[in-house]
Amino acid sequence: MKKWITGMLAIFMGVVSLSIPFAGLHTAEAGIKDTSDKKLKIVTTIFPEYDWTRAVLGEREADVELTMLLDNGTDLHSFQPAVKDIMKVSGCDLLIYVGGESDEWIEDALKSAQNKDMKTINLMEVLADSIKEEETVEGMQENEHGHEHEDEKEYDEHVWTSLHNASTVCDAIAETLTEMDPENKDIYQSNAEAYQKKLSALDAEYQDTVETATQNTLLFADRFPFRYLTDDYGLNYYAAFSGCSAESEASFKTITFLARKVDELGLNSVFTIEKSDDRIAQTVIENTKTKDQNILVLNSMQSITAQEITDGTTYLSVMEENLKVLKEALN
């Protein structure tokens, strides 16, 4: 992966080098500067960042060029940037990205960025005090593919599944936009505060749901990218794989453990994440005593597409739907 990224960056630098001699000629022939250059160019990597930025921008969204890189359903962990993606990052005014292991390519791209005045918001840095290490809970299958540096700590990248974290990042977005566009400071601050009130109200609903629930454990026959969500509300969990795992085939031992936990805890549901094929969940249920559990889907927002956004999907709408699913599972 690292060699592939290095190769892509080399291609990108070659494209940039070839284009520079012709830039002045193009401008002279046109007689005017491209009007798109007058807009702030904001690039986000994933959907939550994109939607939070839209919320903070409010009516100012029409005056910026806002881009979401992963807009075709590609998962953050499997995304491989094309030259056009690296060029978008290199030429933007503000880049908002997660900053975890999956974003190593961005750190490399930033070193070769065309815009030396670019501002960045690294979610892992903004949320430094709240970042959690990946954990392996009882029954969770180890990642057989391993990592390049086994002695390094691995941190959970899925920070956006926490409403608390969302609020903190919105502050950072509003602050950065204010630095870049001070004339509209009041708009950004007001929009951020209004959005944070919605986050807070939804957070209260989550808290009430958990406090009045008859169950407090979730079981995932899948990857588990919801550590930040469950920790916010004191929920317990079991899962086949960690959130960043590359595994997709559960062992007999893992299946057996999860099925026994379903029986032991009297769970009425087994969870998967969006776009799962349900095979592991079905196998777990087939190995329980009653074999009548529901398969429920919790949306981690790792694969939201541009079409879904056009159809009205928002961060809040996904988290509201997730709350409905949790209510069903916990009662």
Locate predicted features.
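Extracytoplasmic metal-acquisition and chelation regions
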Residues: W4-G7, G14-N331
